[in-house]
Each structure stands twice: as structure tokens, then as C-alpha cells.
Amino acid sequence: MVDGDARSELLSADWNGEWMRLQADRRRADDSFEWDKRARHFRPLETAPYARDFMKLLALKPGESVLDMGCGAGSIAIPLAQDGHPVIAADFSPAMLGTLDAGIEYYGLEGRITPLELAWDDDWNLVGPIAKAVDVAFASRSVTTTNLKGALAKLDRTARRRCAVTMVANSSPRYDLHLMNAIGASVTCSNGFVYAFNILIQMGALPQVTYFESPRRDTF
């Protein structure tokens, strides 16, 4: 096969269709009820190294407004608001947003963070932020959707300046690889970032890619 043919097949491949097929084959889809049960464990008491690294890569300008899609309990929304950024913090889990509300009150961030119950698969024209509502829209390890292309397009329509997405490029940070290896358990590595990159190329974007470590750290 010549190089030209290889490039043609790559660019014409139905990356989003393959993503949707993979999501349909998953053993259990992510839903708000699962995250509701985890919410009490997610109250951010400090800015984690991952959040600091991600915020550095965002390279926000002073005072820029942001959409944090899939904000969880506010591990990134809270430090961004503390830095003076107006934040729309959206999540599909009411319990996560309840934990976020507690964090907003604890840190005195009323008026800086606007919680919003919102799922990727919702009709954003009806319940989502308006087009170009914020300077920067991002999703940090939170692209839980059957339609990846649609999700990326929703971020794009919401942002005036730029969008950012982080996706796991190895095993999930939920797992301790040292422990899993020690007990002989297998861990499935994620390749979702490959689909995101190629879908963005097909959408006419020129995505910038950066890899950074996100080591697991347990505290007791």
C-alpha cells in the first residue's frame, strides 16, 4: 500500500462510528447514579498535582471565563475560581454538584462558580450554555459520552478562544498499577485519545497534543 492510499484511508475512516461501537460494547456505561455514589469521596481539600499541571497547560489569561464540563466536586473549578476566573461548573451527577456547593461555601466562592446540571448527551441548545458563552471550555478526564464528535463540537461552540480535553493514555488513575501487577490482575489501557485526535482532524481542527504524568497518590 502506498503512502497516499494509507493517508486516504486514515482520513476517511469513521472514527466516531467506531467510538460509538466501542461504547456500546462496554460492560457498563457511565451514568450519574454511579457518580452520585462516589461523590462523598471527592471533596477537594487541596489542589492535586494533576490539577496544577492541567491548569498550567490551560494557560488562561487573567480573568478569562471557563466551562468545566464534567467538573465533579470541583477539583479544578475551585482553584480556577480562587485565581479569579468565572467558572460554569457542569456535571451530570446531582450529588457531585452538591459536594461542589459545599466546597463553594467552604472556600467563600459564591458568585464565582455557577453550578449547572448537564450531561454530554443533553440538548445543549435547550439546557446548555449559550454559544460562545465562555473564553475557554474544557473537559478534564470527563468525556463520558457515546458520541465523541458531538461532545467535542459542543465544547467548541461554547468557547470563544480555545478548548481543551484530557483523556487517559494508559490505565485509569483509579487503579494502582503496582498493586494490580502484584496480584496478577489485568488492567485495560485506554486509547480514547486516538479517537479524539483523529475526529478533531476530520472536523478541520489542528489539535495540539501534550502528554503528562498523573501518578496516583493515596492519602489516609
Regions found by a protein language model. Name each.
Residues 73-85:
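Conserved SAM-binding loop of SAM-dependent methyltransferases across substrates and taxa
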